[in-house]
């Protein structure tokens, strides 16, 4: 078993499904929190579980530098190392290498660059990126790719796209030859595939509750109750567990090159496909145009992953047009800077007007932060540089993102996604 993808409901291009990995079931469309160094900043793993997170991201480049792939492998891979028994996705390190533009040299073989920590020389290739990701042991890993800058000349984009296609073939070849070396190895129970979407406990009964989430008046199943169990059921039939390698479509802002990249990546053959190379400085309107165009060329029966994109409005809109998986550092990064997402708009909690505001951060949010703490207290923590400020802010922002996706899934299932999205996109900034 690597992954299984099941589509449960559709409405236009939007779809609701479940993605089954060796470590659990994930409802799609899904937002995946980013845990760059095997840690979602400010939130311990038990709270992530409480929030209903069933998949998170790790960063191959950063984990390769510290603590090192060998140390993670010895602990049983990322799952054992970070005490997380739910699903994990790792990127290939390609985007991080791209961001080190002054320190890298790209060739057919791979990329020479220098560590951002100590300047030591490093080399990543499709083979070494696969070796690292197999050692880290995520459920879903990514082919090694090259991301082009924005703006970029067409010939530069074409050359990079073709290189990415050749690297994808090399990535798959190495992965197929070495995938048996995954650190958790052995067998994983795969009976999670039989669990219904609305049941966390695997009994088959509807255990979902209803409460407002994501927007005022939207009654949707709560995440903790609606999310499928992230662990396996007793008595399941063991199946050989392997990782799943996704291909990445590149091509910059050139729609015809995106089509060519999609066709070549599909020809190589992967169980899932990602759209990469966006959120690199282009206008948001251009991002959506590229995403919509690229989705037209991707298989409808495979999960589609949009990499590194997402305000709450954007993840809802991209779910509407057929994206299944999204990630972004925005909710955690914004939280550390006092920017909070609410059903009434974005709030900068550092503003003095909240000094005596005893109301909840978001009266329409059911997260533990909004249930317990006032805006005045959150403002005080942030103004005082208390670590707790970042923790509470991050918990709320992640809750808001996860609630948004839960509401999106619920609306799509009921055929109401257009109504829901119009409410999301009209939120003001406060």
Language-model features, listed with the residues they occupy:
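C-terminal extensions of enzymes
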Residues: 1-18, 26-30, 42, 145-151, ...
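Non-catalytic, usually N-terminal nucleic-acid engagement modules in DNA/RNA processing proteins
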Residues: 1-184, 352-355
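Active-site pocket-lining/capping segments in soluble small-molecule metabolic enzymes
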Residues: 84, 89, 94-101, 107-111, ...
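Structural signal for hydrophobic packing residues in well-ordered secondary-structure cores
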Residues: 137, 168, 172-175, 179, ...
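Glycine- and acidic
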Residues: 149-154, 158, 272-278, 387-390
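Glycine-rich phosphate/ribose-binding loops and adjacent secondary-structure elements
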Residues: 178-181, 244-246, 250-361
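Intrinsic disorder/low-complexity segments
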Residues: 178-242
